[in-house]
UniProtKB/Swiss-Prot annotation:
Record organism: Psychrobacter arcticus (strain DSM 17307 / VKM B-2377 / 273-4)
Reactions catalysed, as given in the entry: L-threonylcarbamoyladenylate + adenosine(37) in tRNA = N(6)-L-threonylcarbamoyladenosine(37) in tRNA + AMP + H(+)
Enzyme class: transferase
Name recorded for this polypeptide: tRNA N6-adenosine threonylcarbamoyltransferase
Top-rank lineage group of the source organism: Bacteria
EC number annotated for this UniProt entry: 2.3.1.234
Length: 349
């Protein structure tokens, strides 16, 4: 089964084709993928502008689709099914992918299915060289979500903890903006932190010892106050370069410390030994190194998506779609998107 995956939930236009007949090959069934990022467009505004995101998806979907077909050396008539991101995300952005996918499926007379964006991230590590077996605990950490989930199977998800305010990735973006760094914040803070001392400043770890939920808004406020205290203006771009690097390193260390300790606590609470980490923030090298070190102490293993599948992409949607389509699930012709969609509402496979 060749499944076309479409991802348009935010500011990346991602398309990919997954072929189940090649799942045991080196590429794990991924025939090809194309990705267009709107980072440069939104960097001018310091964050994603929903209307601009939607327009850019519309502009890029058809050219990217044609590029993907050429890359995979197939025709559109060889596609057996289509999976598109149904939610959560920006409603306008979601609608562009959903309408393109549903219309193409109708024209080709093939099934289509809407996929939960975060389920795509959760299942992406299954396309890696060392795929985890169920059950496992998953940390889904991105610009819009921070979730700890006990995954007992596809569609069998138990929410263990989540952010009660800002997501970790969102906190990275806002801290970066305060430090005068461009969007997206995560990679730029990580780069600046390489030259900083992670122990230079003590930042709070909100809710660290209160269950498995997260809170990052207090950490964001602490960074703002720290910048104001160190340079007097509150404008991080005017700070001494070493001070900025130390603040970035201390902030990153505080976020990572919080995430790692919650993961360890979650594994112990549900008596599991496998952790899957996915989402854009999962690419952070300091987070990966700290997780591997701390999980080794409790004889637990950590699994990641392949590097190209950490951020938003069409491959994870194609694979999640394949798993659900082969179980007999599909959607009717009505196009509907869900900007807010709890993972616990998903049907089991």
């Amino acid at each position: 089964m060749k499944v076309l995956g479409l991802e348009t939930s935010c500011d990346e236009t991602g398309l990919a084709i997954f072929d189940s007949e090649q799942i045991n090959s080196e590429n794990k069934g991924l025939l090809g993928q194309v990705l267009y990022s709107q980072i440069e467009l939104h960097a001018l505004y310091g964050g994603v502008v929903p209307e601009l995101a939607s327009r850019d998806h519309i502009r890029k979907l058809v050219p990217l689709f044609n590029e993907l077909l050429a890359q995979c050396n197939i025709s559109k008539d060889e596609i057996d099914a289509i999976a598109y991101t149904k939610g959560p995300g920006l409603i306008g952005a979601l609608m562009t992918g959903a309408l393109f996918g549903r219309s193409l499926a109708y024209g080709l007379d093939i099934p289509a299915i809407g996929i939960h964006h975060m389920e795509g991230h959760l299942l992406a590590p299954l396309m890696g060289l060392n795929p985890p077996a169920f059950p496992f605990v998953s940390l889904l950490v991105s610009g819009g979500h921070t979730l700890l989930i006990a995954a007992h199977g596809i569609g069998q998800y138990e929410i263990l903890g989540e952010s009660i305010d800002d997501a970790a990735g969102e906190c990275f973006d806002k801290a970066a903006k305060m430090l005068g760094l461009p969007y997206p914040g995560g990679p730029n803070i990580a780069k600046l932190a390489e030259n900083g001392n992670p122990n230079a400043y003590s930042l709070p770890r909100p809710m660290l010892h209160r269950g498995l939920d997260f809170s990052f808004s207090g950490m964001k406020t602490a960074v703002h106050n720290l910048i104001k205290d160190t340079d007097g203006s509150g404008n991080g771009s005017d700070s001494d370069p070493q001070v900025r690097a130390d603040i970035a390193a201390s902030f990153q260390h505080a976020v990572v410390d919080t995430l790692v300790k919650k993961c360890v606590k979650a594994l112990k609470q549900v008596d599991m030994s496998r952790l899957v980490i996915a989402g854009g923030v999962s690419a952070n090298s300091h987070l990966r190194e700290t997780l591997e070190r701390e999980l080794a102490k409790i004889n637990a293993t950590v699994h990641y998506a392949p590097p190209a599948l950490c951020t938003d992409n069409g491959a994870m949607i194609a694979y999640a779609g394949y798993e659900r389509l082969q179980a007999g699930q599909s959607d009717d012709l009505a196009v509907s998107c869900v900007p807010r969609w709890p993972m616990t509402e998903l049907p089991a496979v």
